[in-house]
Amino acid sequence: MTLADRWLLPEGVDEALPEQAAKIEHLRRTLLNLHESWGYHLVIPPLLEYLDSLLTGAGSDLEIETFKVIDQLSGRLLGIRADFTSQVARIDAHCLKDDGVQRLSYCGSVLRTMPAGLDGTRSPIQLGAEIYGHGGVESDVEVLSLMLQTLSTAGLSNLVLDLGHVDIVSGVLAACNLNADQESKLIELYKAKDLPELDRYAEELGCLTDIQKQWLVGLPRLCGGKEVLKHATDLLGDVNESIRDAIVLLQKVSDSICQRFPKVGLHFDLSDLVSYSYHTGVIFAAYVPGHGNAIARGGRYNNIGQVFGRSRPATGFSTDVKALVALTDIVVNKPKTVLSPICSSDELWQKANSLRAEGYRVVEVLDDICAGDADFKLEFVDEAWQLMPVHN
């Protein structure tokens, strides 16, 4: 390895220098304080867990994204977390064991094998919130509201909220009586939004009736504004009860969000299949103009706690603090800086600590550097250490 190579970081792994680090930490504290004001309790799961526990209920996508190492103590396979959700579900199911509604929040680094997000990072700082123990529309609306408030508090505007429901896709596929390979092919086409290929493939499926073909090819075209829900009712309302219930639920959620956040744009995509095997109800994502990737996303996942022996309804969202910092112009109010001689006396030591307790940033001068951005300096005047202005 050459000297130049020693400076390199792995692709998609970055570091924050002082100015950016101050912005990240300021936003992290601000958003966690916001979540606390909504009644969410902070949890700090470990960065490393046994792989089988870490991936429980998470689906194959997360398994591919997870870095794996061998535990030198036990010989078992460990995983470095790529997402917090299964960890928080384990905490709710195994550690807290509260039968009532539980609100939990988290923030920390995750590591992924493949880049994702606005800047192609593999090391985002994930922040999120979860509600356990409530399966009604009220908790869906609360989590959505907190997500939008989180983004607004971070300084983002012109938000667009994308809504969907996995029961609509699963209901259509179930009603068409397809085999596993056929379902997988359709899910692949829905994810790719490849409408011409979807139309061709639907015609090839000789097992379908004409109305079933209309359901399959019409589903990915159900995207747009609130009129989409009426179109969905017209096209899919007679398929089965689960689809009708999903459309009604989306109507209730969207009505509540429009009332609370009238400036947020609303968009529906009823064939959205992000984390299809993972979520069980309403799914959602937030976007800002000019960026194709979601800046926050979430949804309902009622089955995730079952593998930990305690199945509870759950819903939540997550975002990347570093991505939010990159999208906003965060101003961090810096404390006034005081230059101090090296604290060689008890009086100077007490004065420096007193100023720090008042919110000043007191820096001991270790060499002959210039005052720089300092605002004050400590000088011994009239038998006491006093603040004196620095004239730059």
UniProtKB/Swiss-Prot annotation:
- What other remark does the UniProt record contain for this protein? This function is generally fulfilled by the C-terminal part of HisG, which is missing in some bacteria such as this one.
- Source species of the chain: Marinomonas sp. (strain MWYL1)
- Provide the function of this protein: Required for the first step of histidine biosynthesis. May allow the feedback regulation of ATP phosphoribosyltransferase activity by histidine.
Q: Name one GO molecular function term.
A: histidine-tRNA ligase activity
Q: Does the keyword Cytoplasm apply?
A: yes
What CDD domains does the record point to? HisRS-like_core (cd00773)
Listed A to Z, the keywords are:
Amino-acid biosynthesis, Cytoplasm, Histidine biosynthesis
What does UniProt give as GO cellular component?
cytoplasm
- Superkingdom of origin organism: Bacteria
List the subcellular locations.
Answer: Cytoplasm
Subunit-structure text:
Heteromultimer composed of HisG and HisZ subunits.
What is the protein's major site of localization?
cytoplasm
PANTHER family reported in the protein's UniProt record: HISTIDINE--TRNA LIGASE, MITOCHONDRIAL-RELATED, HISTIDYL-TRNA SYNTHETASE
State the disulfide connectivity: none
Protein name per the record: ATP phosphoribosyltransferase regulatory subunit
Q: Name one GO biological process term.
A: histidyl-tRNA aminoacylation
Q: Which residues form a coiled coil?
A: none
Give me the gene this protein comes from: hisZ
